Amino acid sequence: MLNKFLISLGIWVLRLISLLPMPLTRALGTGMGLIAYALMSKRRHIGMVNLNLCFPEKSLAEKQRILRQHFAELFIIGLDYGLLFGASKFRMRRLIKYRGFANFEKYYKQRPIVLLAPHFIGLDIGGNRTTMDISGYTMFSEQRNQYLSERVKQARTRFMIHNGGEIFSRQDGLRTIVKKMKQNKLP
């Protein structure tokens, strides 16, 4: 019961923050990210190990700058998740723009397409925006907390349900989506 309350409170706070002007949200997220960078030594260490493995040629100062920027971006997008839970279609369309969508549409109208996207920061918001314009299926990862999982699923499907889309658990695998596409002849 307490978990549900805290999750609902967190979502409510994110929705309120999402009403702020974007520059203010960015500044708040950057500040929170830099505080987290200073306090979360274990996460900072993991990030530095990864940067050392990927970019051995970069200086320590450059890797620290990249890592601080990552923490800032992570918190910015964390605050932006309020958009998933409450932003209007109008606001989502105004904030999130496509580049090269005509290329996608050209093929989408001809045959089914599987659009694979690596799960970088902010993918959920871009996916949510895309489902306003095209029918399709998407995947999500089940959360440890079932209530949170259901709320995230609701948020990610709130535009998609109007155009025939559906969401599947990542644990079901890509084959499930491909099978559904063939059944419904949905691109």
Locations of the language-model features?
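Soluble catalytic domains of membrane acyltransferases
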Residues: 85-187
